[in-house]
From Swiss-Prot:
Quaternary organization: Homotrimer.
UniProt-annotated catalytic positions: 130 (proton donor), 133 (cysteine sulfenic acid (-soh) intermediate)
Organism: Corynebacterium kroppenstedtii (strain DSM 44385 / JCM 11950 / CIP 105744 / CCUG 35717)
EC number of the protein: 1.11.1.28
Biological process terms in GO annotation: cell redox homeostasis; response to oxidative stress
UniProt-recorded name of the protein: Alkyl hydroperoxide reductase AhpD
Disulfide bonds: 130-133
Family: Belongs to the AhpD family.
Keywords: Antioxidant, Disulfide bond, Oxidoreductase, Peroxidase, Redox-active center
Family matches, as Pfam families: CMD
Function comment: Antioxidant protein with alkyl hydroperoxidase activity. Required for the reduction of the AhpC active site cysteine residues and for the regeneration of the AhpC enzyme activity.
Chain segments annotated as transmembrane: none
Gene3D superfamilies assigned: AhpD-like
MF-aspect GO terms: alkyl hydroperoxide reductase activity; disulfide oxidoreductase activity; hydroperoxide reductase activity; peroxiredoxin activity
Length: 174
């Protein structure tokens, strides 16, 4: 099991992350597609080869090809959007009405349930630190019926995956 490989590779100081990874992978708060789509999208957002390959192997047992592609799409489009919208926010009100002018069709044409894609986008935006995108995607998923607990489950997955990536990077540099 790829997730077990990931957990076994973590050092002792990352024991909490290992436990969180195990607990979150068994979560019943989200549907299977939401859970593993969020795991895969956030893994891709870390830009860590080990995390991406191990989570992809595990996620492929739970997701259709459409969901795998959508998860990678969420990570990719949000990498662009999070930079652009953070910059727009940093630049202030003078830029509020400036048209973004970037293509982002995948958000509405991902090939999967809209709420599931939006949840992945929210989790990736959390990792990328974009306040405006995180809030916008949260508004969408809650208006589509997800609960605050479901939203925060995705946030916990994002936080844990980012922490695991950090530990792996630390160990690679030691």
């Amino acid at each position: 099991m790829a997730l077990d490989n990931l957990k076994e590779g973590l050092p002792e100081y990352a024991k909490d992350l290992k436990l969180n990874l195990g607990t979150l992978s068994r979560s019943t708060e989200l549907s299977e597609q939401q859970l593993w789509g969020t795991f895969l999208a956030t893994a891709a957002a870390t830009r860590n080869d080990t995390i991406i390959s191990e989570i992809a192997e595990e996620a492929s047992q739970h997701l259709s090809d459409e969901y795998v592609n959508a998860a990678y799409g969420a990570a990719s489009i949000m990498a662009m959007n999070n930079v652009a919208y953070r910059a727009k926010s940093f630049l202030g009100s003078d830029y509020a009405q400036v048209r973004m002018g970037l293509r982002m069709n995948i958000i509405n044409k991902s090939g999967i349930d809209k709420v599931d894609f939006e949840l992945m986008a929210l989790a990736v935006s959390t990792i990328n630190g974009c306040h405006d995108c995180t809030k916008a995607h949260e508004k969408t998923v809650t208006s589509e019926g997800l609960t605050k607990e479901q939203v925060f489950e995705a946030v916990k997955i994002a936080a844990t995956i980012q922490g695991v990536a950090q530990a792996i990077q630390i160990e690679a540099a030691r």
